[in-house]
Structure formats: C-alpha cells, structure tokens
Amino acid sequence: MIHLMIMMLERVGIIVILGFILAHTKLFRQALQNQDGYKGKAILISIFSLFSIISNYTGIEIQRNMIVNNDWVFTIDPSGSIANTRILGVEIGGLLGGPFVGAGIGILAGLHRFSLGGSTALSCAVSSILAGVLAGLIGRYFTKRYRMPTPRIAALVGIGMESLQMIIILLMAKPFSDAWELVSMIGIPMILINGTGSFIFLSIIQAIIRKEEQARALETHRVLTIADQTLPFFRQGLNENSCKSVAAIIHKLTGTDAVSLTDKEKILAHVGAGMDHHIPSKSLITGLSKKVIKTGHIMKAISQEEIECTHAECPLHAAIVLPLTSNGNTIGTLKMYFKSPAGLSQVEEELAEGLAMLFSTQLELGEAELQSKLLKDAEIKALQAQVNPHFLFNAINTISALCRTDVEKTRKLLLQLSVYFRSNLQGARQLLIPLSKELNHLNAYLSLEQARFPGKYKIELNIDSRLEQIEIPPFVLQVLVENALRHAFPKKQDICKVTVCVLSDDASVYMKVADNGRGIPPDVLPELGKKPFPSKEGTGTALYNLNQRLIGLFGQQAALHISSEVHKGTEVSFQVPMQQMKEGEEHAQGVNS
C-alpha cells in the first residue's frame, strides 16, 4: 500500500505541474471568467477531460492485488484494473465549471476509461459521470454565493468522490470478492492522494487568480489615481502648462523613464530622462509621432533608431506612442519612454493604452465643459443685453421740455443720461460689477424718472456701506426698481414709496426692493419670474431675465423670491451665500480675462 501511495503521488505531481502551467495561460483564465457561455464551458470540458485521460494513461495496472504495470497503460487485462487520479480532473472541473461541465468531463473521461477495458471499466465509467455531476452541483452552490470553493472544500469533495467510486466498484464489479480485494488495496491510497491532489491543484489556481486580481486592483488604483490628479489639468486643454503637470504625474506614478505630451507640431512637455534635448516648445515632434497623429494608431519603438531621436547620446531606447483624441480627431500624442526595451512589458502597454483612452475622454469632457461654460456666459450676456433703456424716448422728451425753462437741470439730466447708457454698455460686457457702480447706475435712472414725475416717487436706500465693493450682476437693483415704478403704482396714487435694501450677515448678502403699490394678482404671482407671459400690464420678461441671470451665476438658491399683497405692496428679494458670491467673482474674472 505504501509503495502504491508513493507511485500515486508521482501521478498527482504530473497533474499538479500541468495545472500550474495551465493556470498561467490566458485561455484558461478567460474560460473561468466566461464559463456561463458555451465557449467557456467547452474549453473547461476539453482541458479537464484531457487531464483525466492523461490520468487514465498514467494509471498503475493491478491484477490479483499485484502491481503489474508502472508504465503508460493503453489496454487493461480483462481481470485487471488501474489505480489512477482520473477523479481529480473530473472533480476539479466540476467544482470550477458547474454540473454541465462536470457531466461533460465525466462522460468523456468515463468513456475513455471504459475503452481501456478491465474488470472495473463500467463501474469506473459510471463513477466518473456521477462524480462530475455531484462536484458540479457543489461548485454551483458556492458560485451562487459569489465565491470559489476553497482548497479545503476541494479536498473533502475529492475524498468524497473517490469514496463514491470505491462504493460503485463494490456494487458493480464481479465477482464481489475480487472487487473487495481491489478496494482494500487501492481504496485508501486513491482516496488520500486524490484528496491531497485536489487541495494542491485548487490552491495553485486560487493563488494565481488572487495574484492576478491583486495586480489588476493595483493597476486600477494606479490608473484612478492618475485620472484623479490629471483631470484638473486636462480641463484646461492641451497646452504647455497643463501638459507639464500631467507628464510629471504620469512619470511619478508609472515609473517610466520619461513621459512626453505633444500636440500636432511640437513637444508640449517632457519629464524624465532626455530632458536636456527633448525640450518643450523648441523641439518638433518626431517622425514616429507624426505617423501616430496621421494614422490614429498606437505605435511602439524598441530601438533608438525607431524612436527617431537625432541626439547621439539619448538614453531612451524604447517607447510607446499613443494618440490623444477629441471628438474623433487626433490632437496630440502621449509618449512613454524606457531606457531598455525590456521595460516595455505587456503590463506597461496595457497601462499606456488605458491612460491614452482616459486622457482622450478627459480632453473631450474639458472641451465640452468649456463650450458649456461659454454658452452659459453667452446666454447670461444675451439676457443682460435684453435689459434695454425702454424709457429712452420719454427721457429725451423730458430733457427737451426742460431746455427752455431750466438749462442747468437739463445739463445735469444729460449727464445722468450719459452715465446711465455708459453703465448699460459696460454692464452688457461684464458678468459682475461692484455694488457702487450699480448704485451709480440706479441713481442715474432715478434722476431721469423723477424729472419726468417731480415729487411722485419717494426712494429710500438702506445700503450697508461695507458692501460697496462686493461684485453683483449688472442692473440687478435698477431692473427691480424700474419694475416697481412701471407696474406697482396706479396713476392716482399720491405717495409712491420704494425701498432698496442691501444688507449682509457672515453667511449671505441680502438684496430687497419693496414698494407700497397695488400688489400683484394672486393668479399671476406664482409664475412671475419663472417664465415670460403676456398680460395687460406687461410680459414679465425683465424679472424672468434677471432670475435666470442670478440662477446661472450663483445657483438655484439665488433665485428671486416675490411676495405681494393686493393694495398693500410687493417685495422682491434674493440672497447669495458669501461662498457662492466668491465663486461667481472667480468665474467672472476667468470669463472677462
């Protein structure tokens, strides 16, 4: 029995070595990952059936409790049998592939064993099929719980399946006395050796898969880190400043010997070896880069000649050049250099390809973000441009009437009119202006209106003097005051009062324009400022435009709040958090610069 066990260990060693080689193949790993498809199942059946057939051929032939053949077995004497590791391949295949794969392996391995002959040919064939199905069911049980069977489970299943084979031999092989003698001789060695072999085989597969998963997780983390650190720079587009920072990040995190980024004509950044002659902005791109830009395909170089660097002492002897695209057009290249061709491994190639696709996506997103920002700014300026001085003709008529009676007042009104239009023109070109300028604009407007209706309007200004330099959208207060003067007061109302407040606390700036006019009808109030709509009193376009400008610059929290009571008056207000106001100022500076 000991001698048989030693020889069985040799057979298991053959299968384990084959399993070690197999686990490193891409075909096997892909089959494990895609075992739900017919192709993956077919590959697993083929591989483990081959293992089981090899186990049949390398079995140890036994007759009358004696080892008669220790070489490869191609036929078995009718009174003989073999001790082998066939069940190991059937069981492992079933555990990894499920009942369909296990049954397929069991049928092929069993038919092959049956073809060799011997007193246990039929019982071994039947046990192979049952072992494959049962191992497959056990494997599916674990797979449904999103985990692979452990080596310990594999060992227990191996012991169980081999024990099942011994029972089937006792039940089916004739005469029973010979079957009993055979099982007494081979049972313990085969059960122990197949259990041990199953443990080792699955341990190897799990270790290699775990190692690959760890490597993949590490690469994923590295790529995500690079993406996170480079995204702010690619938002700026493909320029020298952004590319220098990006190249430094890639060089640091990938460990390549040098990294270059180019546009279609010149090197934008080069970090690492060769910086003395790969000079940004002064060096034209190489012929290799031109080919990549022209074809849009990845290219590799494994010699200094293929890199096409003209510097005789350039330390770079291998490179991979990848296209950077935006909206389907190649706009530049990413070049990763190595001092030795050995550094350009498959892992580095896949990393470079992933980074190129990621960077291309970032460039497209940056371009889309820029276009969206420009469109948004254009919309805001278009809304500002709609705030036209509709009272122009009335102001001119008023000034014309005063020319003969009060020349000095006429001169002052003309100056105020010029201030008003100058502010209007400047405001149409800016997203934000200081509050002090807005107040000058408002005072110019009020001077012209009060000249038309002397003594009619009482204007109260409650302005926190500390806020005069804060940046606000142009025409905000003027539009709200103009809206109140035009719509709030009936013609016969004696005291027409408008209050303008600009106050703040530590968190927000509050602006409010209130009047004591006739109020807004309840059926109109809910929609006012949210959309233009025709009515006898106006279209609501001014408030709608102002509301859209505030939301566009500061977000929904800066939207207008309108409250009103009929015959008592209306209050229009909004507030902007200090942080949002600072961000709006930075945004405006970026647009106006």
Curated annotation (Swiss-Prot):
CDD domains: HATPase_LytS-like. PROSITE patterns: HIS_KIN. It is a multi-pass membrane protein. Keywords: ATP-binding, Cell membrane, Kinase, Membrane, Nucleotide-binding, Phosphoprotein, Transferase, Transmembrane, Transmembrane helix, Two-component regulatory system. It is an enzyme of class 2 (transferase). Residues 33-41, 110-117, 174-184 are extracellular. Residues 1-12, 61-86, 139-152, 206-593 are cytoplasmic. Residues 363-580 form the Histidine kinase domain. It is found in: Cell membrane. Member of the two-component regulatory system LytS/LytT that probably regulates genes involved in cell wall metabolism. Residues 238-363 form the GAF domain. The gene is lytS. GO terms for cellular component: plasma membrane. One of its GO terms (molecular function) is ATP binding. It catalyses: ATP + protein L-histidine = ADP + protein N-phospho-L-histidine. The chain crosses the membrane at residues 13-32, 42-60, 87-109, 118-138, 153-173, 185-205. The modification Phosphohistidine is found at H390. It comes from Bacillus subtilis (strain 168). SMART domains: GAF, HATPase_c. This is Sensor protein LytS. One of its GO terms (biological process) is signal transduction. Pfam families: 5TM-5TMR_LYT (PF07694), GAF (PF01590), HATPase_c (PF02518), His_kinase (PF06580). Its EC number is 2.7.13.3.
